[in-house]
Every structure is written in structure tokens, then in C-alpha cells.
């Protein structure tokens, strides 16, 4: 968008980066089974101790996401035409602490807002509802609650963690987004898809 997305935050208890790999044979099957990753993303941090998770109140954080996206748009039959690139989004987080568990929301905005599929599906901004895993633990999961438009299916999911050993000061994790349509192979655009996988970090 016009002003660009927020940068990844400069955090004290967590960090992130890119990684790459290539292999000429990744399978025991006959023949060469090549594989490669370019600009994969990772995030890691000092996990919050479970006994230091607050049992009341709330916290707000903000930051950004970096994802690797791939999509196929308005193609038919056996036309491959898959485009791949790296893109970003702004992220705002709210955590609501409870006595036996916590909930929250991740709000993603300006998410790949030039992609025709994401725009048509109304998914340039979406919310993910968070729930702590197995009670009061530093890890949580979430799924998107935003309605997808114009016949698209799919959504977003996250797996994240709270960072800083003594108090939840930062949070990060992985996100995946999937948008798709089903139809006959020879139908124009009927088998379009969009996938994105990456990370987010907030403080």
C-alpha cells in the first residue's frame, strides 16, 4: 500500500530471520528428487515460564509479519502459471489473561493488498482468535474469524508463543493463509489458489 508496512520490531527477548537450503536428492525413491527453499522465515525467543503468565488484565502489542506467498490466478487446464514472492503485513495483538487460560486476537492488516485473489476474497485485513494451549502455557494457537467473500474458501491459522521469562513482553509464531476455489479443470479460474506461510513478531 502507499505508505508501506511497519518493519519487524526490534525486540530484546526474541529474534527472526531468513533461511535457505538446496538438495539434489531428498527421497529414497529412484531418480533425483530435488528440493530447495529460498527466503524461508524463522522466529524464536526466550519462552515465558508458565508460572509467570498473568491471571488477570490484558496486554497490547504491535509488529509485523513476513510471509512467502504463491498463487495461481485466472488459469485453466494444465497451465501452471504459479507466481511466488515474499510479502508483509502489519500485526496488532491483544491478550486477555484469565485464571485458568487466556484468549486474544491477532489483527492482520495490509496483508498482501496488491494480490488479486487476496483482494477479491476480502482478506487483506483479517482477525485470528487466540486460545492458550492446555491452560496457562506460553504457547497458543488460533484460527481466523473473518468472513471470506466472493466464493473463496480457506482462512488463516497461527501457532505462537509468549516471550520473556518473567512477564509476557513479546510474542511471535508462524502463520499460514490458504484461499482457494474448486471447479472443473477446464474452467477459467475455477482452480485458482493462494497460499502464504511465514512468521509474525509483536512487542
Residue ranges of model-derived segments:
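Mature soluble binding/inhibitory domains
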Residues: 1-203
Amino acid at each position: 500500500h502507499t505508505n508501506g508496512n511497519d518493519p519487524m520490531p526490534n525486540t530484546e527477548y526474541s529474534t527472526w530471520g531468513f533461511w535457505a537450503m538446496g538438495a539434489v536428492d531428498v527421497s529414497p525413491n529412484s531418480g533425483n528428487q530435488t528440493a530447495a527453499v529460498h527466503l524461508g522465515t524463522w522466529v524464536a525467543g526466550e519462552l515465558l515460564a508458565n508460572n509467570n503468565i498473568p491471571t488477570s488484565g490484558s496486554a497490547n502489542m504491535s509488529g509485523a509479519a513476513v510471509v512467502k506467498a504463491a498463487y495461481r490466478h485466472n488459469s485453466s487446464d494444465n497451465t501452471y502459471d504459479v507466481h511466488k514472492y515474499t510479502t508483509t503485513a502489519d500485526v496488532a495483538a491483544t491478550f486477555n489473561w484469565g485464571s485458568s487460560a487466556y484468549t486474544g486476537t491477532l489483527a492482520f492488516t495490509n496483508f498482501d493488498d496488491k494480490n488479486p485473489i487476496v483482494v477479491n476474497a476480502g482478506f487483506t485485513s483479517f482477525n485470528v482468535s487466540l486460545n492458550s494451549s492446555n491452560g496457562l502455557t506460553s504457547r497458543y494457537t488460533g484460527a481466523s474469524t473473518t468472513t471470506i467473500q466472493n466464493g473463496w474458501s480457506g482462512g488463516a491459522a497461527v501457532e505462537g508463543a509468549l516471550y520473556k521469562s518473567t512477564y509476557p513482553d513479546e510474542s511471535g509464531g508462524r502463520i499460514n493463509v490458504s484461499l482457494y476455489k474448486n471447479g472443473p479443470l477446464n474452467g477459467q479460474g475455477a482452480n485458482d489458489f493462494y497460499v502464504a506461510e511465514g512468521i509474525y513478531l509483536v512487542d
